[in-house]
């Protein structure tokens, strides 16, 4: 399977998906750690892809998404953004609302 097809499949199969460095329990960078903590606090199920163990995705996703950095949060097939946007949405209560609505819809 081509890397782009793999990315599309991951995004389609996971209504809430975080591309990050490391895993939710063991994030490998500060940005991923802060982003995943905000998502965990929303108490919804979400998928993740560790880009450190998937170098093909690490190199192709920024081109596909037109977003150069990680982490990247995808919700219902749309890129929401990286760490700064995730944290800003979390502080405003918008992240919780978006993720709860998405989880309920796909629950």
UniProtKB/Swiss-Prot annotation:
Entry GO CC: cytoplasm
GO MF: 2 iron, 2 sulfur cluster binding; disulfide oxidoreductase activity; metal ion binding
Keywords, ordered alphabetically: 2Fe-2S, Cytoplasm, Iron, Iron-sulfur, Metal-binding, Redox-active center
Transmembrane segments: none
PROSITE patterns noted in UniProt: GLUTAREDOXIN_2 (PS51354)
Record: residues binding [2Fe-2S] cluster: 29
Domain of life: Bacteria
Positions of the Glutaredoxin domain: 4-106
Assembly, per entry: Homodimer.
Similarity field: Belongs to the glutaredoxin family. Monothiol subfamily.
Function: Monothiol glutaredoxin involved in the biogenesis of iron-sulfur clusters.
Name under which the protein is recorded: Glutaredoxin 4
Organism: Haemophilus ducreyi (strain 35000HP / ATCC 700724)
